[in-house]
Amino acid sequence: MNENLFASFITPTLMGLPIVLLIIMFPNLLFPSPTRLMNNRLVSFQQWLIQLVLKQMMAMHNPKGRTWSLMLISLIMFIGSTNLLGLLPHSFTPTTQLSMNLGMAIPLWAGAVITGFRHKTKASLAHFLPQGTPIPLIPMLIIIETISLFIQPMALAVRLTANITAGHLLMHLIGGATLVLTSISPPTAILTFIILVLLTMLEFAVALIQAYVFTLLVSLYLHDNT
């Protein structure tokens, strides 16, 4: 148990070179483009799931917002697949890195905000001052709304990082406790192993839910600006 608790969150290297780019590109292999007239069950299930998520996410958008459909579905597939790959033993989860999550959140948020200021300038500026605000509170509310606008990408990135990191740390701690208790108290080790299995199943759900939540919030920001 001399391994650092946060060792699994350190970017892996190969011959001194970071291999995070290979890890990030690996999910592309999980979603192959169909090359046959008749798809197999896996590809058919993937296409059905993608269409279902896309239909729910694009239902609230106007035609201008629906032009982002390819971007949003690619985002949810990328985050979901990287989260699931991170659950494999001795693997690395890129979404535990706040820098990477900020790299996804800031451009998407900025694109949505710029779209709003470009096509709906008056409506976008009206968000900074709610209707019916007393005159003495106008400067304070403008400052508060401006801060809340710029904190949105940080909230997106921190939420994803915290949820994925917390789950991985719990799995690491319970897994280590199971190994230690195997020689000390086998009945207790069996109990902790059952808890570890249940937690792993929960983490599979969290990996997909967090991908959906991240993409849904980006979609909501886009909806407010289109």
Swiss-Prot record:
One of its GO terms (molecular function) is proton-transporting ATP synthase activity, rotational mechanism. It catalyses: H(+)(in) = H(+)(out). It is found in: Mitochondrion inner membrane. One of its GO terms (cellular component) is proton-transporting ATP synthase complex. Its main location: mitochondrion. CDD domains: ATP-synt_Fo_a_6. This is ATP synthase F(0) complex subunit a. It comes from Ictidomys tridecemlineatus (Thirteen-lined ground squirrel).
